Amino acid sequence: MTAKVLKRKIALRIKRKRRIRGKISGVATCPRVSIFKSNRTLYVQAIDDVTATTLAAVDGRKLGIKANKEGAVTLAKEFAKALKAKKIDVAIFDRNGYLYHGVIAAFAEALRENGIKL
């Protein structure tokens, strides 16, 4: 992929991200679950937008999780444990500009299977 094409893809994702973020907001009882996907790993956090604080976060690098569907399922299990420890069972899913497909969809479905209502 050329640098020009890559820049365009990133710009389109940022545009989608801003459009989505204008419509959703999380609070302490129902935080925003934001996921970031790199080529190698995944990161996820629960954010209270009112106080601008991170309530829970899981780093895929520290767990040795790769950015594939199996890794997304494992990350969702760990993240669900972290949310349940904070007594959070409802959240708003922020796909962070990524298409709801593949790894992102696998993460969301696994989070629902582990008892977090999105």
Curated annotation (Swiss-Prot):
GO molecular function: 5S rRNA binding; structural constituent of ribosome
GO biological process, one term: translation
Keywords annotated in UniProt: Ribonucleoprotein, Ribosomal protein, RNA-binding, rRNA-binding
Secretion signal span: none
GO annotations of cellular component type: cytosolic large ribosomal subunit
Record has RNA-binding as a keyword: yes
InterPro entries linked to this entry: Ribosomal_uL18_bac-type, Ribosomal_uL18_bac/euk
SUPFAM superfamilies in the record: Translational machinery components (SSF53137)
Subunit structure: Part of the 50S ribosomal subunit; part of the 5S rRNA/L5/L18/L25 subcomplex. Contacts the 5S and 23S rRNAs.
Function: This is one of the proteins that bind and probably mediate the attachment of the 5S RNA into the large ribosomal subunit, where it forms part of the central protuberance.
NCBIfam families given in the database record: L18_bact
Family, per entry: Belongs to the universal ribosomal protein uL18 family.
Listed name of the protein: Large ribosomal subunit protein uL18
Source species: Campylobacter concisus (strain 13826)
